[in-house]
Every structure is written in structure tokens, then in C-alpha cells.
Amino acid sequence: ANPADEPKSIFISAVSTAPLGASHEFALQGREKEFQAGIDALSKLTKGQVHLSVQGIAGSFLNDINGVALHKVSGKHPAGNVGVQIANVDPVNAGEKVWCVHPQDVAAIGSLFLNGKYDPSRVIALTGSEVENPEYYSVIRGAMIEDLVVGKLKEGNVRLISGDPLTGSSVKRKGALGFYHDS
């Protein structure tokens, strides 16, 4: 995004419908204050609305975020795709700009304003049929794939993907986790 541009709105999709995608709800556990502070900061960057799409899980802190237009999304993929949400909620016309922010980046922005420090950590899901025990890990952005998978994969020829199987990128063991990826 060009910082000189003012977006007509900002979208955050906390809905993961892609296969083998990480749960945003799980990834944000313990970062509720940072997430709200990030929303507060983002709301100052647009005269329009900050849109937050959620799955509407009962008891989720995401249902109670202040300063957003809350959208409860359900259904199969691509329902969680932020582009689908924009097209249905606030379509972009010629010359207009809409910004999209990953939920964990909202928390990182909030952390910067609350603590004065950038937090490069990200919660990721190591998943797939060739993973011995699929689980979540807290890593630093750009973590080396080899460090993430050593001793965690089944024997044989394994295809490694940074991101989900539909939109991710094939990576080598010596490669790195994509900047925006959480699986």
C-alpha cells in the first residue's frame, strides 16, 4: 500500500476457509489487547470503515472488537478470501483503494503502539498428510523451512508448501516461510 493514499476502507479477514489453513482465532490467543490497539490505529488511516470478518464462534473475543463493521462469514472456501468479502461488502470502483491487513499483522501493529516495539513473530500451522503430528508453532517471519520440519515429516518424497495448497508457493527445505504465510 502506498502510505500517501487513503483507502476507502480497510478489511481484515479472520476467517480461514482454505484447506490446511491456520486458525486465526487460535493464532491470536493472548493477543486480544494488541489486536484491539491495532484496530484503533488502523481506524485512523481511513475515513471509511474498518471491516472485520469473523466466523462467529461463540465466546470469541473477535465478536467483541470495537471500532469495526463486523461481518459473520460462513461457508466453504473461498468464503474466507478477503477479495470475496470486499466484493460482497464494499466493492472497489475504478480509482478506489481498499487495504487488506492480515489478523496477525493487526496484532503486530497494536503491539508497536502499546509497547513501542515491532513484533515479528507469527503463529503458523504445520499441516498436511506427510506431517507426523500437525500442530501450531510460534516463529519469526521468514523462518527457515528446514528448521520447521526437521524430524516432523514422514519418510519419502514430500512436497513443501509455504502457505495453503491453493495459493501457497512450493519451497525447498533451504527456503523460507513466506512473509504473509501462516501455514
Feature locations, PLM:
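Buried, small/hydrophobic-residue-enriched core segments of structured protein domains
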Residues: 1-183
